[in-house]
Amino acid sequence: MYTHIKSVQILISLLKQFNIRHIVISPGTRNTALVGSIENDVFFKCYSIVDERSAAYFALGLSESLDVPVCVSCTAATATCNYFPAIKEAYERKIQLVALTADQNPYEMFHMEDQCIDQVDMFHGYVKKAVDVPKVMNDSDYWYCNRCINEALLELNHHGKGPVQINYHMSYNLNEISTYDVKKLPITRKIDRYEVCDFKSIENIIKNKKRLLVIGGSNFDKTGKLRDALNRFTEKHNCVVICDTYANIYSENEKIINPRALGDVITQDQISYLEPDLIISFGAIYYSTIKYFIPCYAKNTEHWQIVEDGMINDGYHCLTKVFEMRPEDFFNQINQCSNGMNNEEYFHCWKKRLDMMHFQKLEFSNLAVIREFCNVLPDNALLHTTVLDSIRMSNYAITKPTVRCFANIGADGIDGALSTYLGQGIGEEELVYLLIGDLSLMYDMNALLQKLNSNIRILVINNYAGAEFHKNFGLERIPTLNNYVAAGHNIKIANCCIGSQFEYMMATNMEELKDRLKEFIKPSQKPILLEVFTEADSDANALKAYWNENREEIPGMKISAKAKIKKVMKKILGSNVYNCLLYTSP
């Protein structure tokens, strides 16, 4: 019989799946739920040693002798401190010791609670990985607990062996921690990592998947090897490859697609319609908001990640395999093992939805400006964008696959886009372009103090505020929005550039913009800054209108009762009233 405490169930299940059976136990209350659950499980071999210092050294010797991971389990507070000497020894000698340290409620720390010290990462510098596991109260806690324990156990022998710490929090409800009322231990998700693998067996899994979705994150495929490997992969498997512009995969293959605004307009019903059996991801950050829907609505999906450093990235909450290698090597190896063919059924599901995406006639706004700008970008241009609207809208609008797109989307900060762009531009002979907002430019204005090359082209959209906050809230919801939240201002960038090394241009409407862009993309003696003036609230409304125009049903797809009600409301109220209600309701 096992405890019903979820975090302990997850821990026990993963210890069994990682084949970690030896546990050296010291007495205590906090670890009672764990100890009582494993002592009658024939899988585990338990040893009782009262003194924690001695127990840890005993486990050290056992692990060294058997060349397998060995756990030590103790109660909270100073009991855990007694593990220090053996943990340090294990770290220096590369021995797989697992410190299972039970802990108190963290909210009570330093508030006169008995036996309560700071145990989180207490062995810092002496362990390869330390995780702090909360008590599981909801699905998010469960996912986090599962992920953290997987990460710790995977690190035991990743690029060399060594000790890890799993610190888990327990209540002091004596009845709860001493109740064992679960007959069958629930099996939790295990994550496997491969530095080398049997690609034939991996291919056998892939070929049985009917709906395979490959997702490409930010990346730069300089040689084209990844593109070529993906092209062959799409021919052999029932898959779709989705890459935003920042994946920089230049291919005319129709099965390698940019979902553009789909993540912002897709419904729960459509997520179910497009739900994959398996996701294979590569690259860094994937910007499309599709990634937020998959954990919520795609309940039957498995995720494999390809990443060179082997780091765990469980962004879709369903990661089961990590392949520590270059993505082109993975796909090439799979291609060599495969003789299948894409039946295109899953591809046509995506194509049917993407073919419905369109730009309606746009009022003059930042979306209209960015669309026009992207349309005139030359082939092979280098484009750097700031975060949020610049990334989002350029991803909607860029149609030339050879445009190289970059942005600081790792930490997604507003502050350093200009400096990053100027650094990139130094090594380029052709014109290089920056798409930036007014606040982002002001953040980084001192970057313009250096001498600039004539190939610099900066298009700044000045809507006198942070447009993202107008999209999120709007003046109807927060009338004082521009005072502080959106940082409203009356600054014209022209005033910062007069007398500088720039050739300055400006536009206030579409006709002027088209005229200025003709000169903007031509070589010149000086760098050029083009300032385009829009209005923040109008920009937000234009984006919302674009989203609503593209919230359409897929022909022949079953829709939920909730979706049907929304459709009727929109028809009765009209688009303008419906949109207002949709974006202002709490």
Task: Describe these PLM feature segments.
Residues H22, S65-C74, T80-N82, A90-L97, ...:
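Structural signature of the thiamine diphosphate
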Residues L100, Y107-V120, Y396-L582:
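Thiamine diphosphate
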Residues N82, G216-W304, K400-E428, M442-M445, ...:
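Glycine-rich, anion-gripping cofactor-binding loops and their flanking helix/strand elements
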Residues L100-I149, C243-C349, K451, F473:
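Glycine-rich, acidic loop regions that bind phosphate or pyrophosphate groups
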Residues I5-S73, A79-C81:
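N-terminal cofactor/phosphate-binding cores enriched in small/glycine residues
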Residues V8-K16, S26-R30, L34-E39, W350-E429, ...:
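Active-site diphosphate/adenylate-binding microenvironment
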Residues M1-Y2, I294-D389, T508-S585:
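Phosphate/pyrophosphate-binding active-site segments
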Residues L11-I20, L62-D67, E155-G160, F199-L212, ...:
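Glycine-rich phosphate/diphosphate-binding loops that line cofactor/substrate pockets in enzymes
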